């Protein structure tokens, strides 16, 4: 599969966004001293899901698939902000 400028640009944007989302959740887990092995905690499950999602090789995807991956990370960005902000309010 050929790598184009558009595809490389999309991958770079996804990498930046995914790192931001993952680091937000990781910082929350670490700052609140949550047990990273406790699968009963929503934040820990979210962290593990994001870790798995970050491991995919984006260069194997088509541009259309990358756009879907980008939307996934946008959704996870919004969701993680909602979940972590609710914890602060509660």
Swiss-Prot record:
Keywords: Plasmid, Toxin-antitoxin system. It comes from the Bacteria. One of its GO terms (molecular function) is toxic substance binding. SUPFAM superfamilies: Plasmid maintenance system epsilon/zeta, antidote epsilon subunit (SSF81710). One of its GO terms (biological process) is response to toxic substance. The keyword Transferase does not apply. Belongs to the epsilon antitoxin family. Antitoxin component of a type II toxin-antitoxin (TA) system. Neutralizes the toxic effect of cognate zeta toxin. Part of a postsegregational killing (PSK) system involved in the killing of plasmid-free cells. Continuous synthesis of the epsilon antitoxin is required to counteract the zeta toxin. Has a short half-life in vivo. In the presence of the zeta toxin, forms an inactive PezA(2)PezT(2) heterotetramer. The heterotetramer is still able to bind the zeta toxin substrate UNAG. This is Antitoxin epsilon.
């Amino acid at each position: 599969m050929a790598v184009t400028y558009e595809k490389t640009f999309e991958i770079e944007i996804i990498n930046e966004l995914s790192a931001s989302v993952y680091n937000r959740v990781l910082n929350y887990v670490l700052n609140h001293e949550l047990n990273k092995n406790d699968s009963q905690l929503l934040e820990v499950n979210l962290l593990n899901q994001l870790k798995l999602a970050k491991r995919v090789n984006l260069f194997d995807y088509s541009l259309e698939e990358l756009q879907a991956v980008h939307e996934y990370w946008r959704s996870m960005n919004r969701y993680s902000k909602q979940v972590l902000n609710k914890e602060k309010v509660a």
